[in-house]
Amino acid sequence: MKILANDGIDAKGQAALEAMGCTVLTEKVNQDALAGFIQNENIDGLLVRSATTARKDLIDACPNLKFIGRGGVGIDNIDAVYAREKGVDVFNTPASSSASVAELVMSMLFASNRFIYQAGGSMPVNGEETFEVLKKNYGKGKEVKGKTLGIIGFGRIGQSLAEYALGCGMRVMFFDRSKTEQTVVLSINGSPVEVKLNVSSFEEVLRESDFI
Protein backbone atom coordinates (compact mmCIF):
# COMPACT_ATOMS: atom_id res chain seq x y z
CA MET A 1 0.00 0.00 0.00
CA LYS A 2 1.25 3.46 -0.94
CA ILE A 3 0.47 6.34 1.42
CA LEU A 4 1.01 10.07 1.04
CA ALA A 5 1.45 11.94 4.34
CA ASN A 6 0.97 15.34 2.78
CA ASP A 7 1.18 17.38 5.97
CA GLY A 8 4.02 15.38 7.48
CA ILE A 9 4.07 12.45 9.87
CA ASP A 10 6.01 11.60 13.02
CA ALA A 11 8.99 9.34 12.42
CA LYS A 12 7.54 6.68 14.72
CA GLY A 13 4.28 6.65 12.80
CA GLN A 14 6.09 6.39 9.50
CA ALA A 15 8.24 3.54 10.82
CA ALA A 16 5.15 1.69 12.07
CA LEU A 17 3.47 1.94 8.67
CA GLU A 18 6.61 0.86 6.85
CA ALA A 19 6.97 -2.10 9.21
CA MET A 20 3.56 -3.24 7.98
CA GLY A 21 4.78 -3.10 4.40
CA CYS A 22 3.46 0.34 3.44
CA THR A 23 5.37 2.82 1.33
CA VAL A 24 5.08 6.28 2.91
CA LEU A 25 5.75 9.45 0.92
CA THR A 26 6.28 12.60 2.97
CA GLU A 27 6.83 15.21 0.28
CA LYS A 28 4.48 18.20 0.41
CA VAL A 29 2.29 18.45 -2.68
CA ASN A 30 0.48 21.72 -3.38
CA GLN A 31 -3.28 21.52 -3.13
CA ASP A 32 -3.85 22.29 -6.82
CA ALA A 33 -1.50 19.47 -7.87
CA LEU A 34 -2.62 16.95 -5.28
CA ALA A 35 -5.22 15.04 -7.30
CA GLY A 36 -2.83 14.56 -10.21
CA PHE A 37 -0.07 13.40 -7.89
CA ILE A 38 -2.32 10.87 -6.19
CA GLN A 39 -3.38 9.41 -9.52
CA ASN A 40 0.06 9.44 -11.15
CA GLU A 41 1.76 7.88 -8.12
CA ASN A 42 -1.01 5.33 -7.50
CA ILE A 43 -1.56 6.54 -3.95
CA ASP A 44 -3.87 4.31 -1.89
CA GLY A 45 -4.15 6.43 1.24
CA LEU A 46 -3.92 10.14 2.02
CA LEU A 47 -2.90 11.38 5.46
CA VAL A 48 -3.52 15.05 6.27
CA ARG A 49 -3.56 17.44 9.18
CA SER A 50 -5.12 20.89 8.82
CA ALA A 51 -3.20 22.34 5.86
CA THR A 52 -4.47 19.94 3.20
CA THR A 53 -8.14 19.66 2.26
CA ALA A 54 -9.91 16.67 0.75
CA ARG A 55 -13.07 17.99 -0.88
CA LYS A 56 -15.54 16.49 -3.32
CA ASP A 57 -13.48 17.46 -6.38
CA LEU A 58 -10.39 15.68 -5.04
CA ILE A 59 -12.39 12.58 -4.11
CA ASP A 60 -14.00 12.45 -7.56
CA ALA A 61 -10.63 12.89 -9.26
CA CYS A 62 -9.03 10.03 -7.29
CA PRO A 63 -11.25 6.94 -7.74
CA ASN A 64 -8.47 4.61 -6.55
CA LEU A 65 -8.09 6.34 -3.18
CA LYS A 66 -8.99 3.91 -0.40
CA PHE A 67 -8.79 6.07 2.72
CA ILE A 68 -8.21 9.56 4.07
CA GLY A 69 -6.76 9.88 7.56
CA ARG A 70 -6.75 13.06 9.63
CA GLY A 71 -3.95 13.48 12.17
CA GLY A 72 -6.07 15.31 14.72
CA VAL A 73 -9.61 15.56 15.99
CA GLY A 74 -11.63 17.72 13.61
CA ILE A 75 -12.36 16.60 10.05
CA ASP A 76 -13.79 19.89 8.77
CA ASN A 77 -11.21 19.90 5.97
CA ILE A 78 -12.52 16.59 4.61
CA ASP A 79 -15.87 15.98 2.89
CA ALA A 80 -16.20 12.88 5.03
CA VAL A 81 -19.82 11.98 4.28
CA TYR A 82 -19.28 12.22 0.54
CA ALA A 83 -16.03 10.26 0.75
CA ARG A 84 -17.72 7.40 2.59
CA GLU A 85 -20.55 7.39 0.06
CA LYS A 86 -17.86 6.86 -2.57
CA GLY A 87 -16.33 3.98 -0.62
CA VAL A 88 -13.39 5.97 0.76
CA ASP A 89 -12.81 5.30 4.45
CA VAL A 90 -12.29 8.39 6.63
CA PHE A 91 -10.80 8.31 10.10
CA ASN A 92 -9.19 10.66 12.59
CA THR A 93 -7.11 10.39 15.78
CA PRO A 94 -9.54 11.60 18.47
CA ALA A 95 -7.20 11.20 21.44
CA SER A 96 -4.10 12.64 19.81
CA SER A 97 -4.38 16.20 21.13
CA SER A 98 -6.10 15.66 24.48
CA ALA A 99 -2.95 15.91 26.59
CA SER A 100 -1.62 18.84 24.55
CA VAL A 101 -4.81 20.85 25.02
CA ALA A 102 -4.97 19.96 28.71
CA GLU A 103 -1.37 21.09 29.22
CA LEU A 104 -2.11 24.35 27.41
CA VAL A 105 -5.08 25.00 29.71
CA MET A 106 -3.00 24.28 32.79
CA SER A 107 -0.17 26.51 31.56
CA MET A 108 -2.63 29.37 31.06
CA LEU A 109 -4.09 28.70 34.49
CA PHE A 110 -0.65 28.95 36.11
CA ALA A 111 0.34 31.96 34.01
CA SER A 112 -2.80 33.94 34.81
CA ASN A 113 -2.55 33.21 38.53
CA ARG A 114 1.13 34.13 38.69
CA PHE A 115 1.04 37.22 36.43
CA ILE A 116 3.61 35.58 34.16
CA TYR A 117 2.42 37.35 31.02
CA GLN A 118 2.44 40.78 32.67
CA ALA A 119 5.76 40.19 34.40
CA GLY A 120 7.33 38.89 31.21
CA GLY A 121 6.41 42.13 29.48
CA SER A 122 7.21 44.58 32.26
CA MET A 123 10.31 43.17 33.91
CA PRO A 124 12.65 43.38 30.89
CA VAL A 125 11.54 46.96 30.19
CA ASN A 126 11.10 48.52 33.64
CA GLY A 127 12.46 45.91 36.00
CA GLU A 128 15.71 47.67 36.82
CA GLU A 129 14.08 50.98 37.79
CA THR A 130 10.84 49.72 39.35
CA PHE A 131 11.73 46.22 40.50
CA GLU A 132 10.35 46.63 44.02
CA VAL A 133 7.02 47.94 42.73
CA LEU A 134 6.71 45.22 40.13
CA LYS A 135 7.71 42.55 42.61
CA LYS A 136 4.97 43.73 44.92
CA ASN A 137 2.38 43.86 42.14
CA TYR A 138 3.25 40.48 40.71
CA GLY A 139 3.81 38.81 44.05
CA LYS A 140 0.09 38.49 44.71
CA GLY A 141 -0.34 35.29 42.78
CA LYS A 142 -2.57 32.47 43.94
CA GLU A 143 -1.88 28.79 44.38
CA VAL A 144 -4.11 26.45 42.40
CA LYS A 145 -3.69 23.64 44.91
CA GLY A 146 -6.89 23.30 46.90
CA LYS A 147 -8.88 25.38 44.41
CA THR A 148 -11.83 24.05 42.41
CA LEU A 149 -11.68 23.61 38.64
CA GLY A 150 -15.00 23.35 36.82
CA ILE A 151 -15.00 21.56 33.47
CA ILE A 152 -17.88 21.97 31.03
CA GLY A 153 -18.05 18.89 28.84
CA PHE A 154 -16.21 15.78 29.99
CA GLY A 155 -14.97 14.09 26.85
CA ARG A 156 -11.38 13.08 26.19
CA ILE A 157 -9.96 16.59 26.61
CA GLY A 158 -12.01 17.29 29.74
CA GLN A 159 -10.89 14.03 31.33
CA SER A 160 -7.26 14.68 30.42
CA LEU A 161 -7.52 18.13 31.97
CA ALA A 162 -9.00 16.59 35.10
CA GLU A 163 -5.97 14.30 35.40
CA TYR A 164 -3.59 17.26 35.40
CA ALA A 165 -5.73 19.27 37.80
CA LEU A 166 -6.12 16.39 40.25
CA GLY A 167 -2.37 15.82 40.06
CA CYS A 168 -1.89 19.43 41.15
CA GLY A 169 -4.11 18.91 44.18
CA MET A 170 -7.16 20.64 42.77
CA ARG A 171 -10.76 19.69 43.33
CA VAL A 172 -12.49 18.90 40.04
CA MET A 173 -16.17 19.33 39.19
CA PHE A 174 -17.69 18.65 35.81
CA PHE A 175 -20.93 19.10 33.92
CA ASP A 176 -21.80 16.87 30.99
CA ARG A 177 -25.20 16.17 29.47
CA SER A 178 -24.44 12.53 28.71
CA LYS A 179 -22.61 11.40 31.85
CA THR A 180 -23.59 10.85 35.48
CA GLU A 181 -20.16 9.81 36.71
CA GLN A 182 -16.67 9.20 35.38
CA THR A 183 -13.59 7.49 36.74
CA VAL A 184 -10.38 9.35 35.96
CA VAL A 185 -7.18 7.29 36.10
CA LEU A 186 -3.98 9.07 37.10
CA SER A 187 -0.55 7.54 36.61
CA ILE A 188 1.61 8.25 39.67
CA ASN A 189 5.17 7.01 39.14
CA GLY A 190 3.78 4.31 36.89
CA SER A 191 1.08 3.22 39.32
CA PRO A 192 -2.59 3.82 38.40
CA VAL A 193 -4.76 5.78 40.82
CA GLU A 194 -8.49 5.87 40.15
CA VAL A 195 -10.56 8.91 41.12
CA LYS A 196 -14.33 8.69 40.76
CA LEU A 197 -16.09 11.95 39.89
CA ASN A 198 -19.83 12.53 39.91
CA VAL A 199 -21.52 14.93 37.53
CA SER A 200 -22.67 18.30 38.89
CA SER A 201 -25.32 20.58 37.50
CA PHE A 202 -24.27 23.46 35.29
CA GLU A 203 -25.36 25.89 38.00
CA GLU A 204 -23.32 24.07 40.66
CA VAL A 205 -20.20 24.22 38.53
CA LEU A 206 -20.65 27.95 37.98
CA ARG A 207 -21.33 28.59 41.65
CA GLU A 208 -18.59 26.50 43.25
CA SER A 209 -15.67 26.69 40.82
CA ASP A 210 -12.69 29.00 41.24
CA PHE A 211 -11.79 28.42 37.59
CA ILE A 212 -13.89 27.15 34.68
Model region roles, listed by residue range:
Residues 1-91, 207:
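An N-terminal-biased, well-structured beta-alpha scaffold segment characteristic
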Residues 25-30, 49-50, 126-137, 191-199:
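Short gly/ser/thr-rich secondary-structure transition/capping motifs
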Residues 16, 104, 108, 160, ...:
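Rossmann-fold NAD(P)-dependent oxidoreductase module
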Residues 86, 94-148:
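Phosphate-binding beta-alpha-beta segment of Rossmann-like dinucleotide-binding domains, i.e.
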Residues 135-211:
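Rossmann-like dinucleotide/phosphate-binding beta-alpha-beta segment
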